[in-house]
Amino acid sequence: MTDTLTITRPDDWHLHVRDGAALEAVVPHSARQFGRALVMPNLRPPVTTAAQAVAYRDRIRAAVPPGTAFEPVMSLYLTDKLPPEEIALAAEAGVRALKLYPAGATTNSDAGVTDIRHTYKTLEAMQKHGLLLLVHGEVTDPAVDLFDREAVFIDRVMIPLRRDFPELKVVFEHLTTQEGAHYVRDANRFTAATITAHHLLYNRNAIFTGGIRPHYYCLPVLKRETHRVALVQAATSGSDRFFLGTDSAPHPAHLKEHALGCAGCYTALTAIELYAEAFDSVDALDKLEGFASFHGPDFYGLPRNSGTITLKRESWTVPETVPYGDATLKPLRGGETVHWKLM
């Protein structure tokens, strides 16, 4: 049994850090363990121009603790009306991707895409300039059951999108289903996916055990056990199609514990420890470095990190709350035990 594990410094390819005092509170949590993070653009208002992305990047960099090597990788928010001309400016500014949110699918997605066909000229420009498309893979059709939204998205959006843009690099974000895992596994080399720690560790029972547990509520929502098992199999398979993306999504505790609670699990505080626990549960720690440190930068066409981190098999208690501007934030598994610790 391995009691210590040293891996190349990992990256987080799906992270929410918000803005202002909230940003200042959470960025250090990610910076202590990751070399880079792909930052989501769903602010209010959303990040839709290269100039906005550069300004946001500067604010994130300013929140990184001195002496810590952490670089935000920026994305734009794709809308029906985002002009193709903005793509060249984005590429020049170092923006790496655009995020497709179906309108109304998740937090701050009101300005999202209503019909993927409205964005085709912009997608053509992205394919030309080498920017990636990151998709929140759910339909928002009210006739589709909440737990089926990902599978229906594959049929209605992903398959036509891949047919029309075969060489556009697409990341299926935060996979939650067996259908999604198999789709990415069997797709062409321009398709990959991120998987969260909470979708590897928990199924939908976690939301309801002993009462409503709002800190396990996220979108896409946790699914049944068969899907969790399929995600673990994908993540630990060694396939370079799958890589780490926490989708860590901070919300003040009082807005999670609310009649209309916000969707999102805050995992950035303990992210790499939670992933280690998930991989250890199926005796696959030897596959963690590829998933966490290699597959993401390889797909994005970026160099791998040169530093390392070390994890130790040690049980410790996650803080119940952490400061979050004028509020508090409850991390996933707050007050409970995690069985690996970042040294």
Swiss-Prot record:
One MF term in the entry's GO annotations: dihydroorotase activity
Residues at which Zn(2+) 2 binds: K99, H136, H174
Annotated Zn(2+) 1 binding sites: H14, H16, K99, D247
Domain of life where this protein originates: Bacteria
Residues annotated as binding substrate: H16, V17, R18, N42, H136, L219, H251, A263
GO CC list: cytosol
InterPro entries, per the entry: Amidohydro-rel (IPR006680), DHOdimr (IPR004721), Dihydroorotase_CS (IPR002195), Metal_Hydrolase (IPR032466)
Keywords: Hydrolase, Metal-binding, Pyrimidine biosynthesis, Zinc
Pfam families: Amidohydro_1 (PF01979)
Cofactor info, note text: Binds 2 Zn(2+) ions per subunit.
Modified residues (N6-carboxylysine): K99
Protein's pathway: Pyrimidine metabolism; UMP biosynthesis via de novo pathway; (S)-dihydroorotate from bicarbonate: step 3/3
EC number in record: 3.5.2.3
GO biological process, one term: 'de novo' UMP biosynthetic process
Active site: D247
Cofactor(s) it depends on: Zn(2+)
Subunit structure: Homodimer.
UniProt xrefs under HAMAP family: PyrC_classII (MF_00219)
Protein task: Catalyzes the reversible cyclization of carbamoyl aspartate to dihydroorotate.
Family membership noted in the UniProt record: Belongs to the metallo-dependent hydrolases superfamily. DHOase family. Class II DHOase subfamily.
Protein name: Dihydroorotase
Native species: Variovorax paradoxus (strain S110)
Gene name of the encoded protein: pyrC
